[in-house]
Protein backbone atom coordinates (compact mmCIF):
# COMPACT_ATOMS: atom_id res chain seq x y z
CA UNK A 1 0.00 0.00 0.00
CA UNK A 2 1.40 3.35 -1.04
CA UNK A 3 2.11 5.88 1.72
CA UNK A 4 2.12 8.91 -0.58
CA UNK A 5 -0.32 11.83 -0.52
CA UNK A 6 -1.95 12.32 -3.91
CA UNK A 7 -2.47 16.05 -3.29
CA UNK A 8 0.77 17.28 -1.72
CA UNK A 9 3.15 14.47 -2.74
CA UNK A 10 4.28 13.85 0.85
CA UNK A 11 5.93 10.45 1.31
CA UNK A 12 7.90 8.63 4.03
CA UNK A 13 11.32 9.93 4.98
CA UNK A 14 14.09 8.16 6.89
CA UNK A 15 15.81 9.15 10.09
CA UNK A 16 17.04 7.72 13.37
CA UNK A 17 15.66 6.73 16.75
CA UNK A 18 18.14 8.13 19.27
CA UNK A 19 18.40 6.60 22.74
CA UNK A 20 19.65 8.31 25.91
CA UNK A 21 22.99 6.59 25.30
CA UNK A 22 23.01 8.24 21.84
CA UNK A 23 22.66 4.90 20.03
CA UNK A 24 21.01 5.39 16.66
CA UNK A 25 18.76 2.93 14.84
CA UNK A 26 17.09 3.53 11.50
CA UNK A 27 13.39 4.36 11.32
CA UNK A 28 10.81 5.79 8.91
CA UNK A 29 8.73 8.89 9.50
CA UNK A 30 5.35 8.21 7.85
CA UNK A 31 2.94 10.92 6.66
CA UNK A 32 -0.54 11.07 8.20
CA UNK A 33 -2.37 9.42 5.26
CA UNK A 34 -6.15 8.87 5.16
CA UNK A 35 -8.33 7.47 2.39
CA UNK A 36 -11.17 9.88 1.59
CA UNK A 37 -13.90 10.04 -1.03
CA UNK A 38 -13.87 13.27 -3.06
CA UNK A 39 -16.68 14.53 -5.27
CA UNK A 40 -15.09 16.01 -8.39
CA UNK A 41 -16.52 19.11 -10.14
CA UNK A 42 -18.15 16.92 -12.82
CA UNK A 43 -20.09 15.03 -10.11
CA UNK A 44 -18.11 11.78 -10.06
CA UNK A 45 -16.78 10.38 -6.80
CA UNK A 46 -13.24 9.07 -6.42
CA UNK A 47 -11.29 7.59 -3.51
CA UNK A 48 -7.88 9.18 -2.97
CA UNK A 49 -5.19 9.01 -0.29
CA UNK A 50 -4.45 12.37 1.28
CA UNK A 51 -2.40 13.68 4.19
CA UNK A 52 -3.87 15.97 6.83
CA UNK A 53 -2.47 18.99 4.96
CA UNK A 54 -3.89 17.69 1.67
CA UNK A 55 -7.31 17.40 3.31
CA UNK A 56 -7.13 21.06 4.37
CA UNK A 57 -6.15 22.05 0.81
CA UNK A 58 -9.13 20.16 -0.66
CA UNK A 59 -11.52 21.82 1.79
CA UNK A 60 -10.13 25.28 1.01
CA UNK A 61 -10.64 24.66 -2.72
CA UNK A 62 -14.30 23.74 -2.03
CA UNK A 63 -14.14 20.05 -2.95
CA UNK A 64 -16.85 17.92 -1.32
CA UNK A 65 -14.89 15.52 0.94
CA UNK A 66 -16.46 12.48 2.65
CA UNK A 67 -14.28 10.89 5.32
From Swiss-Prot:
Transmembrane regions listed in the UniProt entry: none
A biological process from GO: translation
Keyword terms, alphabetized: Ribonucleoprotein, Ribosomal protein
InterPro entries tied to this protein: Bacterial_rp_bL28 (IPR050096), Ribosomal_bL28 (IPR026569), Ribosomal_bL28/bL31-like_sf (IPR034704), Ribosomal_bL28_bact-type (IPR001383), Ribosomal_bL28_sf (IPR037147)
GO cellular component term, pick one: ribosome
One Pfam family here: Ribosomal_L28
One term of GO molecular function: structural constituent of ribosome
Superkingdom, taxonomy of origin: Bacteria
PANTHER family, A to Z: 50S RIBOSOMAL PROTEIN L28, LARGE RIBOSOMAL SUBUNIT PROTEIN BL28A
Family that this chain belongs to: Belongs to the bacterial ribosomal protein bL28 family.
Protein's UniProt name: Large ribosomal subunit protein bL28
Organism listed in the record: Nitratiruptor sp. (strain SB155-2)
Amino acid sequence: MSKKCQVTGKKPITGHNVSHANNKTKRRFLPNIRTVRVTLPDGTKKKIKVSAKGLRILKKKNFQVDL
